[in-house]
Swiss-Prot record:
Described purpose of this protein according to its UniProt entry: May interact with a ClpP-like protease involved in degradation of denatured proteins in the chloroplast.
GO cellular component term, pick one: chloroplast
Protein name: ATP-dependent Clp protease ATP-binding subunit ClpA homolog
Pfam family, one: Clp_N
Xref: Gene3D superfamilies: 1.10.8.60, Clp, N-terminal domain, P-loop containing nucleotide triphosphate hydrolases, UVR domain
Protein localization: Plastid, Chloroplast
Record keywords, A-Z: ATP-binding, Chaperone, Chloroplast, Nucleotide-binding, Plastid, Repeat
Similarity annotation: Belongs to the ClpA/ClpB family.
Taxon lineage: Eukaryota, Rhodophyta, Bangiophyceae, Cyanidiales, Cyanidiaceae
GO MF term set: ATP binding; ATP hydrolysis activity
Residues annotated as binding ATP: 238-245, 579-586
UniProt main location, coarse: plastid
Length: 854
C-alpha cells in the first residue's frame, strides 16, 4: 500500500536534505517523497533520533542503517535479522567507528551527501523493480548499492556479505509479491484491506487455522444469508467464548475445500481490524478516506467477504467532532448488497449498541450462537488435540479431555464452553511441559557469567573505553557460542526424550488447574486428606465442645461434597443451627472454615441484624441501577463470586427482614442467584449455615413434661421434646417453602458443667499462647480453675459468662502486674486463689503442691 506522508513531513524532509529551488523543483521532489511508505518514513525519523542519541549534528548512512534496524518490522529489518544482525551490535560497531559527538545537536539535523545519495538510490531501486512505492527494503538496497559509507563498513565488520544480503532482499520481495492471491503485476487487488486486515482464506491454505468441529447449522445459516441479493450480512451473536470467530474461520476452510455453493466459490474471507484502521489517523478525513478506499477495493474485487469481530466497535469509530462514524459510512453499502460482511458480537453489546440503531440493525441478519453441550465440547477438544499436542510436544489423554469439559462446566460458572475447557487443556499442557523441562546447571552458570560480562562491557562503552569493551565483547561472543552449543545439545536430548517418551496430560493435571483457578479441591483424594476427612469430627471437637449432632451433620456434608457424591445442582448442604446463646453455633462455623476451607477468612459472614429494614435487602445482591453503590456489587454475590468454595454464615437469621428469606429460596434449591447486574452467581460449592436463637425460651425450660421417666433416659427425652418444640416455633416464624428447602435443622444442647470445664481448658490455652509471645510463662492451679467455672457457669447463657469471668479474674489481674513491673519478660507466673476467693499471682517456683493446668 502507498502511504502518503503529510505535507509538513515532506517540507521538513526537503529542508533537511538542503533541497531548494523553484516551485517546479518542489513539486518534483514532493512527488518523489510521496512514494515513501509509513515504515520508510519511520526509518528516516529513527535515523535522526539515532544521530541525537550519539550527539552527532548530521544524519549519515550509519544512522539510516540503525533506523532500519530500529523500525524492526519491515522487509529490510527482517533480512538483516535473518543474517544475525541486531540493533545492539550495530550500535556498538557504529560507536567504535565514528565515536560519540560533542553533544550539541541542532533542532534540524541535515543529511550528509552520502545519505542523500542513498535516498536517491532507493527511489532508483524502486523504479527498477517496477514498484510504485519506496519501502525499507529499497532503502537497504540503496545502502548496499552505494557500498562505500560507514553503514557498509559496519555490515562488513559484522560479517555480512553485501551481495548475498542484496539477493536475500530481492528474494524476500518476490515472496511477498507471490503471497497476494489473484494479483496483477505481483500486487494485490485489495492492498488497503490487506494492510488493515487478515486474510483468513490464505491462513486456511497455509494450515494456520485451528480445525472447526461442529457448528454446521450456524455455518449453513451464514452461507444462506451471504447468498441473499441485498442485506446479505449475517451477525453472529453469542456469549463470550462460545466460538463466534471460529464460525468465520470454518467458512474460510469450507471455501478452500470447495464445500460451499457456487455463489461463494473463490471468495476471500478477510477480517478487518477496526482499531488498526483508526490508529494513526491524525488529520480529519484520513479515517474516512481509508474506509472508502477499502469499500472501493471490495466493490472492485467482487470476491471479498469482510469479517468484523466485535462489530459494535463500528459505532462511533473514527467519529471526531462533526465527522461521520464507520457504521454510517458502511450503511448504504450494507443495505444494497455491495458489501458482504460477517459481524460478531456478544448479546450484551448487540443490545447496548446495535439494537439502539434501528437502521443498522435491519442491515444485519442475526445468527444466534449457543453454548455447546459438554458432549459437543468433548468433540471440539478432540478435534483440537493434535494442535495442542504439537505446540506443547506432549500427549493429551482422553480422560484429560473429558475432565476438562466436565470440570469446567461444573466448577467455572462465569465463563462459557468451549473456551474455558480449551483454556484448561492449554494451561494444563503448559504446566506439564514446564515440569518436564529444566536448564542444566552448567547453562545456568554460563548465563550468570554472560550477564556479568554484558554489565561490565556496557559500563566501558558508557565511559568511552572501546578498546577494552571490544575484548569483553569477544568474551561475550565466546560465552554465547558455548551457551548455544550447550542449549542445542540439551534441546536435542530433550527432543529425543520427548519423541520416545512424551509426557502425558491426564485427569489430575486438569483437576489441579481447576483448583488453582477456583480454589475448589477437585483433584483425587490423597491418603492424608482421606484420613483427615474420616476423622473430621475429632478435629472439630478439638475446638468445639459437645454438640455431637451438629458436628456429625456438618462432617457428613463435607465428606459427601469432597468425594463427589453431592447433588451437583445444589449447595453442599444447608443447615439451620438453633439453640441458646453462647453454645457454639457461630464457633462451629468458624472452626469448619478454618480447618477445611483454608482459613477463618474463607467464611462469608453476614450479620442479619444489618438487614432488618426492607431497603437494606438489596445490599445482598447489589443496588439497582440509579442508586448509590450500583457498581460495587452485592455483599453476598460478590463475596461468593470471588471465592466460590466457601462457608456462608447467615448469623441471627430471624433478625433479617422477611424479604431476605424470599431471596434465599433459589440459593437453597438451585444453588444460584442473579445479582443486580444480571450475572448468575454459582452457590453450588458453598456450605450454607443459618444460626438462630428462636426457641431459646423452650430450651431454657428444657422441654420438661409430666410423668415418670428413667434417670438414664431423662436427658435424651428432654432433648427430643425440646427439639420438637423448637421446630414448632421455627414453623411459626418461617414460611414452609423456606424450611422445606433447608437440609437439616440442628438444635444445639445447653452446655453442662463438664463441657464448660473443657471450654475453660481451651480458653486458658489461648491465653497461655498470647502471654508466651511476650516471654512470660503462665500456669494456673486447680483451685483457680474451680473458681473460674463456678463464676462462669450459667446454663442459660452458654460459654460467654465464662469468657467474662476469665477477663475479670485472670486478664485484669495479670495486666496490672505487668504494668506495675512485678512480672517481666522471662518470668514464670502461677495464678492461684486464697481462702477468701481472691486471685493471687505467684512468681517463680512455688511451694504449693497444687496441680497445674498446662
Amino acid at each position: 500500500m502507498n502511504i502518503q506522508p503529510n505535507t509538513f513531513f515532506l517540507k521538513a524532509m526537503l529542508t533537511l536534505l538542503n533541497i531548494k529551488g523553484n516551485n517546479m523543483c518542489w513539486a518534483h521532489k514532493k512527488n518523489m517523497f510521496e512514494r515513501f511508505t509509513e515504515k520508510a518514513v519511520k526509518v528516516i525519523m529513527l535515523a535522526q533520533e539515532e544521530a541525537r542519541r550519539l550527539g552527532h549534528n548530521f544524519v549519515g548512512t550509519e544512522q539510516i542503517l540503525l533506523g532500519i534496524l530500529g523500525e524492526g518490522t519491515g522487509l529490510a529489518a527482517k533480512a538483516l535479522k535473518s543474517m544475525g544482525i541486531t540493533l545492539k551490535d550495530a550500535r556498538i560497531e557504529v560507536e567504535k567507528i565514528i565515536g560519540r559527538g560533542s553533544g550539541f545537536v541542532a533542532i534540524e539535523i541535515p543529511f550528509t551527501p552520502r545519505a542523500k545519495k542513498i535516498l536517491e538510490l532507493a527511489i532508483e531501486e524502486s523504479r527498477i523493480l517496477t514498484h510504485n512505492y519506496v519501502g525499507t527494503e529499497h532503502l537497504l538496497l540503496g545502502l548496499i548499492k552505494e557500498g562505500e559509507g560507514v553503514a557498509a563498513r559496519v555490515l562488513e565488520n559484522l560479517g555480512v556479505d553485501l551481495p548475498k544480503l542484496r539477493s536475500n532482499i530481492i528474494r524476500m520481495i518476490g515472496e511477498t509479491s507471490e503471497v497476494s492471491v489473484g494479483a496483477t503485476s505481483g500486487r494485490s487487488k485489495v492492498p488497503t484491506l490487506e494492510e488493515f486486515g487478515t486474510n483468513l482464506t490464505q491462513m486456511a491454505v497455509e494450515g494456520k487455522l485451528d480445525p472447526v468441529v461442529g457448528r454446521a447449522k450456524e455455518i449453513e445459516r451464514v452461507v444462506q444469508i451471504l447468498g441473499r441479493r441485498t442485506k446479505n450480512n449475517p451477525v453472529l451473536i453469542g456469549e463470550p467464548g462460545v466460538g463466534k470467530t471460529a464460525i468465520a474461520e470454518g467458512l474460510a476452510q469450507r471455501i478452500i475445500n470447495n464445500e460451499v455453493p457456487d455463489t461463494l466459490e473463490d471468495k476471500k474471507v478477510i477480517t478487518l481490524d477496526v482499531s488498526l484502521l483508526v490508529a494513526g489517523t491524525k488529520y480529519r478525513g484520513e479515517f474516512e478516506e481509508r474506509l472508502k478506499k477499502i469499500m472501493d477495493e471490495i466493490r472492485m474485487a467482487d470476491n471479498v467477504i469482510l469479517v468484523i469481530d466485535e462489530v459494535h466497535t463500528l459505532i462511533g469509530a473514527g467519529a471526531a467532532e462533526g465527522a461521520i462514524d464507520a457504521a454510517n459510512i458502511l450503511k448504504p453499502a450494507l443495505a444494497r448488497g455491495e458489501l458482504q460482511c460477517i459481524g460478531a458480537t456478544t448479546l450484551e453489546e448487540y443490545r447496548k449498541h446495535i439494537e439502539k440503531d434501528a437502521a443498522l440493525e435491519r442491515r444485519f441478519q442475526p445468527v444466534m450462537v449457543e453454548e455447546p453441550t459438554v458432549e459437543e465440547t468433548i468433540e471440539i477438544l478432540r478435534g483440537l488435540r493434535d494442535r495442542y499436542e504439537a505446540h506443547h510436544r506432549l500427549k493429551i489423554s482422553d480422560s484429560a479431555i473429558v475432565a476438562a469439559a466436565k470440570l469446567s462446566d461444573q466448577y467455572i460458572a462465569d465463563r462459557f464452553l468451549p473456551d474455558k475447557a480449551i483454556d484448561l487443556v492449554d494451561e494444563a499442557s503448559s504446566r506439564v511441559r514446564l515440569m518436564n523441562y529444566k536448564l542444566p546447571p552448567s547453562a545456568e552458570y554460563l548465563d550468570e557469567e554472560l550477564r556479568h560480562i554484558q554489565k561490565i562491557k556496557n559500563e566501558l562503552i558508557r565511559s568511552g573505553d572501546f578498546e577494552e569493551a571490544s575484548q569483553f565483547r569477544e568474551r561475550e561472543i565466546e560465552v554465547k557460542v558455548q551457551m548455544a552449543a550447550l542449549m542445542k545439545a540439551k534441546k536435542e536430548a530433550i527432543e529425543e526424550e520427548l519423541a520416545l517418551n512424551p509426557p502425558i496430560v491426564n485427569e489430575d493435571d486438569i483437576a489441579n488447574i481447576v483448583s488453582s483457578w477456583t480454589g475448589i479441591p477437585v483433584s483425587k483424594l490423597t491418603k492424608s486428606e482421606s484420613e483427615k476427612l474420616l476423622h473430621m469430627e475429632e478435629t472439630l471437637h478439638s475446638r468445639i465442645v459437645g454438640q455431637n449432632e451438629a458436628v456429625i451433620a456438618v462432617s457428613k456434608a463435607i465428606r459427601r461434597a469432597r468425594v463427589g457424591l453431592k447433588n451437583p445442582n445444589r449447595p453442599i448442604a444447608s443447615f439451620i443451627f438453633s439453640g441458646p446463646t453462647g453454645v457454639g453455633k457461630t464457633e462451629l462455623t468458624k472452626a469448619m472454615a478454618s480447618y477445611f476451607f483454608g482459613s477463618e477468612e474463607a467464611m462469608v459472614r453476614l450479620d442479619m441484624s444489618e438487614y432488618m429494614e426492607r431497603h437494606t435487602v438489596s445490599k445482598l445482591i447489589g443496588s439497582p441501577p440509579g442508586y448509590v453503590g450500583y457498581n460495587e456489587g452485592g455483599q453476598l454475590t460478590e463475596a461468593v463470586r470471588k471465592r466460590p468454595y466457601t462457608v456462608v454464615l447467615f448469623d441471627e437469621i430471624e433478625k433479617a427482614h422477611p424479604d431476605v428469606f424470599n431471596l434465599l429460596l433459589q440459593i437453597l434449591e438451585d444453588g444460584r442467584l442473579t445479582d443486580s447486574k444480571g450475572r448468575t452467581i454459582d452457590f453450588k460449592n458453598t456450605l450454607l449455615i443459618m444460626t438462630s436463637n428462636i426457641g431459646s425460651k423452650v430450651i431454657e425450660k428444657k422441654g420438661g413434661g409430666l410423668g415418670f421417666e428413667l434417670e438414664e433416659n431423662i436427658e435424651e427425652l428432654q432433648y427430643s421434646r425440646m427439639r420438637n418444640l423448637v421446630n414448632e416455633e421455627l414453623k411459626q416464624y418461617f414460611r414452609p417453602e423456606f424450611l422445606n428447602r433447608v437440609d437439616e435443622i440442628i438444635v444445639f444442647r445447653q452446655l453442662t458443667k463438664d463441657e464448660v470445664r473443657d471450654i475453660a481448658h481451651i480458653m486458658l490455652r489461648e491465653i497461655f499462647e498470647r502471654v508466651k509471645q511476650q516471654g512470660i510463662s503462665l500456669q494456673v492451679t486447680e483451685r483457680f480453675k474451680n473458681l473460674l467455672i463456678e463464676e462462669g457457669y450459667n446454663p442459660s447463657y452458654g460459654a460467654r459468662p465464662l469468657r467474662r469471668a476469665l477477663v475479670r479474674l485472670l486478664e485484669d489481674s495479670l495486666a496490672e502486674e505487668v504494668l506495675s513491673g512485678k512480672i517481666k519478660e522471662g518470668d514464670n507466673a502461677m495464678i492461684d486463689v486464697d481462702e477468701n476467693k481472691q486471685v493471687k499471682i505467684l512468681l517463680g517456683n512455688s511451694n504449693n503442691q497444687h496441680a497445674f493446668l498446662a
